[in-house]
Structures are given as structure tokens and as C-alpha cells.
Amino acid sequence: IRRTPGGRGTDGWVFKDLKVGDQVKIAGPYGRFFFRTARENAAIMIGGGTGLAPLKSMVRHVLETGTGQTMYLYHGVRGAADLYDVEFFRGLAAEHPDQFFYRPCLSEEDGVEGTSHGLVTDVVMGDFPTLRGMVAYLCGPPPMVEASLKMLMRKRLFPRDTYREDFFDSSDKATGGVRSPLIRTS
């Protein structure tokens, strides 16, 4: 868990009251950010930081239920220390080579084996001449989600085929967060 200065959840509870070994009850999820298995389109999935977590759940669901959609998962972080579940995703990619593709992207660190260097949006831009006919799932910090939306539009993937989940912290809320008039929020 990353501490957010002034955050109600981290400063006001996790780092203030909890100790290693404490048990917590978690409920949910209650949102509308889920994989649409009725859509047979290939999916481009872009997660920033901890935005990878819901995408991991989607990937597992699709592979376990055998619905058959092809998935391209990109995980954007600053450096290799911010990556997680790398071996898990590499294992899935090896096990499902025609259905699942995984690409970790480091924006501030270069030369790390098995990763791409650059902003996750730039890496996706370079990998696909067009994204027409696909669906997109975006999850992470609002600036990354907004940059991804713009990139998807340039690559011919439009709002009706895009699902998103923004992670807001207390600093985002103080400024009103980041919202796009181009897309529905899941």
C-alpha cells in the first residue's frame, strides 16, 4: 500500500492504526468496471501502477472461463521496483501464447530486461498501426487514463468501445479530479 499524505485511508487508518498481521474485512467490488465477455473483440488493457489489479482479475476470468477473447495487457510504471506480478503474467503469456500478451513499460528506467522503455501510451502507439475493432480497458491514475483516451482516439478506438476506472486520491479530489467529456465512466 502506497501512503498518500493526508489520505483518509492511508494516513488516517492504514499507517496510523494497522499493524502487520491485523485482519481487515473488505467488501466489493461494487462498480461497473468489468470485462464484457459478450463482446468478442480483442481487448487492449492499460494499467498504471496499482491499476493493474482489476485488469488482472479480468485476465484471469477470461482465461479461466474460456470465452476466447485475445487480450493485450500493458502495465505502465516509473521503474522496475514498481512492477508486480511480472512472473504471474509472463507465465500466463507462455501458457496462452495466442490469446494473452503482456508488456511491462517503464517510463523512468531503461535497459531492464523484458520491459519496454517509455510512457505506456507511447509503447502502445508503437505496437499497433490501428486499434479499430478492439475494446479498451483503462485503469490507473487520472493523467494516465486521460493520456490513454487521447492515444486510443488517435488509433481509431472510440469512446463507445472504451471502459475506464480512474484512481483518485485526496489531491485529485481537492482539484476536482480529471474528467473527460469523451467517455463514460464505469
Regions found by a protein language model. Name each.
Residues 70-186:
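Reductase modules of NAD(P)H-dependent flavoproteins
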Residues 56-64:
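Histidine-anchored nucleotide/phosphate-binding helix
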Residues 1-23, 41, 77-79, 105-108:
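Ferredoxin-reductase
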Residues 9, 31-38, 175:
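Short, Lys/Arg- and Gly-enriched loop/turn segments at beta-strand edges
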Residues 34, 54-57, 147-148:
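Phosphate- and divalent-cation-binding pockets in alpha/beta enzyme and binding domains
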Residues 36-49:
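Short, compositionally biased
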Residues 36-39, 65, 130:
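Short, flexible hinge/linker loops that cap or flank conserved catalytic cores
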